Amino acid sequence: ETDTGMLFDVLLHVGTLIAICAVYYKDIVRLFVEGICIVRDVLINFAALIKNLFLSIRDRGKDHVDYSPYRRIVNSSYRKFVVLILVSTIPTGIIGFVGKDVVEQASELLIVPGICLIATAILLFIADRCKGGDKLPKDITYTNAFVVGIAQGVATLPGLSRSGTTITACLLSGFNRKFAVKYSFIMSIP
């Protein structure tokens, strides 16, 4: 690929990122804040774990030991949203890393983008006909998020629409239509 082609791809992705940030800026800020709070609570729980281990060793044999309580990490829809995005990112990263050479070779064959464009059309047809569901972050399982991450990883093939693939995967997993679109675009940021 030429430098001009690479520059075009980078600028295209930057433009998409700017558009996503403009549309979902309130959600992105809230997700960022909740992500920081998740890290804080994990560190507090780790400190409580160390303290409780020390207390259990020190106070072995006593009838009552005053253990430190643990904080619940995923205690809101936005925190669940953050964790779901992280779960979706794992298979995407693995597929992207492992399949890098396959994607590069597939880009050189005209038949692959052609087949993938047809696959995109079929996926968009399915998404249009799919009733979807009513799942919001609190109802979505981590398995659902993992499957959507796999769909995003597969969508690195040339000609396969990333958003079309992930929105279809979301709808087939029972996501609410509006949330499926939001999830698809926000999960493209990391």
Predicted features, each with a name:
Residues 1-190:
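Multi-pass membrane proteins that catalyze or facilitate reactions on polyprenyl-/lipid-phosphate substrates
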